Regions:
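C-terminal and late-domain segments of enzyme folds
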Residues: 2-45, 52, 56, 62, ...
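Structural motif
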Residues: 11, 103-107, 138, 179-180
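Short glycine-rich anion-binding loops that position phosphate/pyrophosphate groups of nucleotides
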Residues: 15-17, 109-111, 143
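Glycine/Thr-rich phosphate-binding loops of Rossmann-like dinucleotide-binding domains
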Residues: 19, 114-115, 148
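Portal/gating segments that form or line small-molecule/metal binding sites
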Residues: 50-109, 113
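Catalytic-core regions built around general acid/base machinery
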Residues: 97-100, 120-134
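Catalytic nucleophile loop
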Residues: 105-108, 131-150
Length: 251
């Protein structure tokens, strides 16, 4: 493998992508800047987009794929395919899709169950090989958490209800750091402060409408022009130093 291949990750803290609500109304599309940058990183005008919605239950993965297909195919002219979780044990099928893809995108959902499934099937190793080969690895929420050493996750809330706590968990470890998506949501910043007391990682927290782009050893933020929820999008770096908790905005 060439030493000149760049490794690329775009980790989106959250944001709406134009999906339909249960009442038939459509949410806005907030992530244009992030999606355009993901495409730009491939170096191709019409790259191949592979959606892996494994943080969702199998029965929800097709609907999520159609939302992302409307963005990447209809808006931007990408060729779009998906890899559903019930196909992960089909080694040749998985290899064919991964080899085809320029972009590999994971959506939002249950990070804990997703990482467990990837490790049980060996798909975690497949994803690492894809990243090392220069494919753009990206996603939102759970699909952002997964690339880092650790994350703060609401997986128990998703599975069992809002009375469950936020948890810290190990992820794929492509990038050092404890990643926090939706850090503008109640309790998130307090949770990462506590998690970092017993972790040797640095906290990397992204609000909705903010993405952290990592190309090799270079980091930068991608921030949406406007937020549907009316928040000021931002990213934070946080850590403990000699008993003092430090939290700084990432510029």
């Amino acid at each position: 493998m060439s030493e000149n291949i760049s490794k690329k990750i775009v980790a989106i803290g959250g944001g709406e992508n134009g999906r339909l609500k249960s009442d038939g109304t459509r949410l806005p599309y907030e992530l244009e800047k992030q999606d355009r940058e993901i495409i730009r990183l491939t170096g191709k005008e019409n790259p191949n987009f592979l959606f892996i919605g494994h943080s969702q239950l199998l029965e929800n993965q097709e609907g999520y794929f159609q939302v992302m297909k409307a963005v990447y195919e209809q808006r931007y002219g990408c060729s779009c395919k998906d890899l559903k979780s019930n196909k992960l044990n089909d080694v040749e099928y998985v290899k064919t899709l991964i080899d085809w893809a320029d972009i590999i995108y994971e959506g939002g959902g249950n990070t804990l169950d997703m990482i467990k499934m990837w490790k049980e099937t060996g798909f975690d190793k497949t994803l690492r090989q894809a990243w090392e080969s220069g494919k753009v690895m990206c996603g939102v929420s759970a699909g952002a958490n997964c690339w880092f050493k650790e994350c703060s996750s609401d997986s128990l809330k998703i599975k069992y209800g809002d009375d469950q706590p936020l948890i810290g968990m190990e992820c794929l470890g492509f990038i050092d750091g404890l990643f926090v998506s939706h850090c503008d949501a109640p309790g998130r910043r307090e949770n990462v402060k506590e998690l970092l007391r017993t972790s040797n990682q640095v906290g990397l927290s992204m609000s909705n409408c903010t993405a952290l782009e990592i190309v090799d050893d270079k980091y930068r933020l991608i921030i949406s022009d406007a937020s549907y929820h009316g928040i000021e999008a931002y990213g934070l770096k946080s850590y403990w130093d000699n008993g003092k908790y430090l939290e700084k905005k990432i510029n």
